Design a protein with these regions (language model features):
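Beta-propeller folds
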Residues: 12, 19-455
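Sec-dependent N-terminal signal peptides
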Residues: 4-14
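Short, Lys/Arg-enriched, disordered terminal segments
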Residues: 1-5, 19-20
Length: 455
């Protein structure tokens, strides 16, 4: 009996050696920690007058709290449903301002405790800087007075930063257009508790489609409801004194962009139906231009759901795309349309056409240029100067053209024709400056353009 009791005691002691120790996260020795957890040099943003620099600081690595946050994946988005901002944001933890002729930087005062800063944006006259701060419950809007280096909170934690830029400056430098959570916002559906709102229906109509394997797609009716919920906002005009005015009622706002002169606002909204096989950038959308008071001027684009695409890397959708304000004009839109039905297999003389459309959009758009390859981008200069790039994946060819945007009959001049993978032939990037509208345009001096490259 004594032998049996001794055996049981030995067994218990032996098993206890294998029990899980109650360990917490440990830190390595100081010598190792100093190598890994070093303080990063700040990033720098300077005003165009070269008077002030903004220095931004961030952690070398994300914190465990950042990595452990709740995440919801819908329609290609990864967001934190509690704070209503992307779950992949890397936050800034400190801000300093330095006057160029000063020896030392000034710590920005009034910052929130434990700052989690993102979405920095200079005002048009560069006297203020707006930023968002993420709390445990949501996103707040703050503003910094550059001259005094003092930060002030403008809103509660009700900014919706789930999709696109959460705010944009008005031209008056005193007001900010802000996406906010609707006051009557419903609670998100919980897949573990709430029954599906409807069946999952897949249609197989025999159409051919070259789709990639996308991540984080919508899967059911509950996902659809939650997706609509998280991207729905109300647009508010928020004065820097804290006063707020409803600008536009609730909708699924994807993007807001003021014209260079500040008199017009281009707003893009996501529309229905949603898709289970492509992400939100291929969902239906509508683009409307309003005046600065919020009065509708013109619906300038409507894009249907496009789940089916032609084969090839140079395939694109039909209709207006790449719609943006022209940086060197007060209020002119530029956009691109495919001349080959978006299908690289179609043999045509020109692949794309670039058009211009002047506000208030009473007249029809005018053609500016047709490209032989797929449109790759444009850099505006002035009335007679712009740079256009086209490209073709199959041949790896990219061409850069010097054009006169005011004369469609003047032949574009090819200034670079090269293989995009040949880095030795890369002439560099065109130097740009900010113009009277605060927009980036080509730096032109004595009719010369300048490029900066690795050499």
């Amino acid at each position: 009996m004594k032998l049996k009791a001794s055996f049981i005691l030995f067994l218990c002691l032996g098993l206890s050696a294998f029990a899980q120790e109650n360990l917490t996260y440990q830190k390595p020795s100081k010598s190792i920690l100093d190598l890994a957890d070093f303080e990063r040099a700040p990033s720098v943003s300077m005003d165009t007058k070269k008077e002030y620099m903004l220095l931004t600081y961030r952690n070398t690595y994300k914190t465990l709290d950042d990595l452990n946050q709740e995440e919801m994946r819908l329609g290609g988005l990864r967001i934190n449903p509690v704070t209503n901002i992307s779950s992949t944001v890397t936050y800034i933890n400190n801000l300093k301002i330095r006057k160029i002729n000063a020896k030392n930087e000034t710590q920005v005062s009034g910052l929130p405790e434990n700052p989690r800063i993102s979405n920095l944006s200079w005002s048009p006259n560069e006297t203020k800087i707006a930023f968002s701060h993420t709390t445990a419950t949501g996103v707040e809007l703050w503003v910094i007075d550059v001259a005094t280096a003092k930060a002030t909170k403008l809103t509660a934690a009700n900014v919706n930063a789930n999709l696109g830029n959460p705010f944009s400056w008005f031209k008056d430098n005193e007001s900010i257009l802000v996406k906010m959570l609707p006051k009557n916002r419903a609670a998100l559906l919980d897949a573990k508790k709430d029954l599906p709102l409807g069946p999952i229906i897949s249609n197989a109509d025999g159409s051919k489609s070259q789709n990639r394997t996308y991540q984080d797609l919508l899967k059911n009716k509950n996902d659809e409801a939650n997706f609509e919920n998280i991207i729905t906002s109300e647009l508010y005009k928020v004065n820097i004194n804290g006063a707020t005015t409803l600008f536009k009622s609730a909708d699924m706002y994807a993007g807001e962009d003021f014209s260079p002169d500040g008199n017009y606002l281009m707003v893009t909204t996501i529309e229905k139906p949603f898709s289970y096989i492509v992400p939100l950038n291929r969902f239906p959308s509508k683009t409307v231009v309003y005046d600065k008071e919020g009065k509708m001027v013109k619906t300038v684009n409507e894009v249907p759901l496009f789940e089916i695409m032609p084969k090839g890397f140079m395939a694109t959708r039909t209709g207006k795309r790449s719609m943006n304000w022209r940086n060197d004009k007060p209020a002119t839109l530029s956009f691109v349309e495919a001349l080959d039905q978006g299908d690289p297999a179609n043999k045509v003389d020109f692949r794309d056409e670039i058009s211009l459309w002047n506000a208030p959009f009473d007249a029809a758009p005018t053609s500016m240029m047709k490209t032989k390859q797929r449109y790759g981008g444009i850099i505006w200069g002035n009335e007679t100067t712009a740079i256009v790039v086209d490209q073709w994946y199959d041949t790896r060819n990219t061409k850069t053209y010097l054009i006169n945007p005011s004369d469609a009959n003047q032949a574009p001049k090819v200034i670079s024709d090269r293989n995009s993978q040949d880095i030795y032939s890369d002439p560099g990037n065109f130097e740009t400056i900010k113009n009277q509208y605060g927009k980036r345009v080509l730096a032109i001096e004595n009719n010369n353009l300048f490029l900066i490259g690795a050499g």
